[in-house]
Structures are given as structure tokens and as C-alpha cells.
Amino acid sequence: MNEILQVHSLSKSFGAIQVANNLSFSVNEGEILGIIGPNGAGKTTLFGMLSGHINPSNGQILFQGEDISGSPTHERARKGIARTYQIPRPFGQMTVFDNLRVAAIFAGGLSGLDATEWIERTLATTGLSRFSDSLAGKLPLLVRKRHELARALAMRPKLLLIDEVSAGLTEQEVTEFIEIVKRIRNMGVTIIWIEHVIRTMVSATDRLMALAEGEVLAIGLPKTVIDLPEVKRVYLGN
């Protein structure tokens, strides 16, 4: 199986505070890799380094065999890396459709009819077709989270970084979100998904990586990882 992403000895410190320490792992094409860890484990910092928003102090990031460690965010987006945010950041006075158009044109490299067709497919995939003409700033929570996912998908990513989309959702809404994510994977998109809800990660991912204090604690099959004593200790204490 081909590896789309390789991370080698990635570290980040802010002054004297080490938030990521010697992270090394790889992601296979077409898989959903889940990431869990308590607050302060370094999950969001890792996403920042992968997407280009945060420069690592040390280490290397290879995307499809190319070293992107020093590449800016917009170049990584053009190469096929997109991410969502815990707090959605749409253009509130623009429609759902127009938000996706911005992503499809400026990051996805599409224009004209090609952009329109891709946006319509993205809306259908994420269950947002009927909200196409709604103002993004007026959407309810569930729809807002789907819209955040749709904006990232509109960029035509090869690798999609999903950051805690299930917070505040009901169990049924989380189940629906998992189905959407799996549909996106079936479109050929590789996914790395950060989430606090362990049950979601076990049911949605192919492999699971546990972080603690900026280090990789374990990586493997989801049920195997969550049953490890060291992972239980991080979440439940001694």
C-alpha cells in the first residue's frame, strides 16, 4: 500500500514549552487515520504543522514523496492538503455555494462549469444541496459543521485533515457525520481525523494514533490501541 504522508521526527516548541516531540508516523493512501489524546497532547499543533500554519522546529514532512516541511499553506493546499477547524470560519455574508466556489477556484484550481459541477457534487456528498443559497453565517450548528467539511472538500484534496467536527452533536448526528466522512474517503480522499469521542474513532477509522504530551503513545488498530494500559492511563489515570 502506498504511503501518501510520511512524518519524520517532527518537533515543535514555543520558547521553553515543547508541544510536539519527535513525532514519526505514516499515512496510507485511502485510509482514515484517527488521532486521539487529552487536551495539550499536541493534536492541533500537529495539524498546524501538516497544513503549513505552524513551522516545525525540527523534522520532515513528506507528501507524496515530496518534502513540504518549509512550504507555505497555500502551496500545500494546491498540492492537495485541506483541513477543517474546530470553530467554522466561513464567509458569513456569502452563500454556502459561493463559499465553496472560493475554495474550488483558489485552492482547487477549477473554473467555470468544472467548478460548478464539483461544487454541486460536494454539496450532495455532504448533504447540503438544499442549503446552497443560504447565508453561511446563518446556518444552524450541524449544517455549519457540514459546511466546514464541504469547504475543505471543495478544494479537491488528496489529504483531508478533520479537526473535532463531532463536538456538540447528538449521537445520531455523529453517525450521519461518520457516513459523510466515509463517502469522502470513497471518493479517493485520504483522511486524518482528530476527535475526543473514543466511540466515534473506533467506529470510523482504519487505524488509531494516540498522542500524549506531544509524543506518539501508540498507533495501530483502533480497538487494540484503546485497550493498551498506557492509553487507558492517559485517559483515566492510574
Model regions: which residues?
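Glycine-rich phosphate-binding loops of nucleotide-dependent enzymes
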Residues: N2-N238
